[in-house]
Amino acid sequence: MECHRLPRNLALHFEKFEDHLYKMNINSTKSMTGHLLGAAGAIEAISTILSIQHNVVPPTINHFTDDESIDPNINFTFNKAQERVVNVAMSNTFGFGGHNACVVMRKLV
């Protein structure tokens, strides 16, 4: 899941995924691009498409300290890209003024 940002209270945001949460990657490419304002969602969606195409999950960079609120069993893809089969991916974008979008994409077989 490509997140526009990683939430502060992780448990509340990811509880809907139940056990699937521990089988997936969560990342934020915004950590590498900065905030691109109106282009942020498009760039994040392109990154998600490339992740599906190349089976590589890009990292969330610049994570240097452990946060006690982060479950260590959740794969946030910190600081290093990970190769894995990516068949389905979701990109979330939450913009200024309440402009929110979630796009789910899958690999065509």
List each language-model region with its residue ranges.
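Conserved "HGTGT" condensation-loop signature of ketosynthase/thiolase-family condensing enzymes
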Residues: 1-109
